[in-house]
Structures are given as C-alpha cells and as structure tokens.
Amino acid sequence: DLNDGLKAYFTDNSFDYVIMSQTLQATEQPDALIEEMLRVGHEGIVTFPNFAHWSARVQLALQGIMPVTKNLPNQWFNTPNVHLCTLIDFEELCARHGIEILQRTVVDRSHRKGSWLMKLFPNLLGEIAIYRFCRNR
C-alpha cells in the first residue's frame, strides 16, 4: 500500500530512479509519497493527468460538472483520484518541499509531444504531465 510509505521495503538511496505513473493523484498524501520517492531514490519521475487541460476547464466552466475526459474517465463519485492537480500545482508543491524539477514534458492522450502551442501553453494544452525531479542540489 503506497499510502503506508516505502520504509518497510526499501532503505535510503536504494535506486537511481523511482517512477510513479498515473498514480500520484490517487494517493492519500502525494507530498509524503514524493518525499519517500526521493528517500529511496536519487531521482523521481511522475506522470499524472493535468486537471487544467482545456477540455476539463470547459466542462467545469460551461456545464458546471466535474470533468470526465479520456484521462479522467470516472465520475466524481467513483473516481480513485482524490488529489487532482495541474502543472502549476505540482511545481508549487516541489518548490515548497525543496525539490528541483529537472525536466518537464507534457503530452496528449496518445503520449505525443505537442506542437509549439502546447509548448507555449502547457498547462492549458497538455493532457498528461511528466516530471523528472530530485532534491535541490
């Protein structure tokens, strides 16, 4: 159970990389889990659905409903996602915890890197966020 942490399973610096794909938003304490990732590994890599993608914004703003998209396919009442976030939210969390972002990539639902527009407006046009990070050096 990731919500219980990794201490019972791994010692400090057991790995070069710790990867969590499409799971962070479904944990009880994402910030504590990121800390655990960096305790057992030198670097972390996470991916998560971007709640600020334009399609989610449109559903919330114009229809007044919690978004249901290909990357957020469940209704609000049966979703495993308990901590939805945006690129900006994740970057603020990292800053508060002394975590350095080494690389950020945003992709569409088919995992393709976008056009220059996606690079210009990643929080609006990126459907999935991918971050590589470490403790501040």
Model-identified regions with their sequence ranges:
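Short gly/ser/thr-rich secondary-structure transition/capping motifs
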Residues: 1, 24, 28, 113-114
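Adenosine-cofactor binding site in Rossmann-like domains, unifying the SAM/SAH pocket
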Residues: 1-9
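Active-site micro-motifs of SAM-dependent methyltransferase domains
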Residues: 4, 25, 53
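Short, flexible segments with low predicted structural confidence
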Residues: 8-9, 16, 61-66
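Structural alpha-helical scaffold elements that stabilize or flank donor/cofactor-binding regions
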Residues: 9-11, 37
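Alpha-helix C-terminal capping/helix-to-coil transition sites in glycosyltransferase folds
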Residues: 13-14, 40
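A short SAM/SAH-binding and catalytic strip from SAM-dependent methyltransferases
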Residues: 16-30, 48-49
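S-adenosyl-L-methionine-dependent methyltransferase catalytic module, highlighting the catalytic core
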Residues: 32-36, 43-137
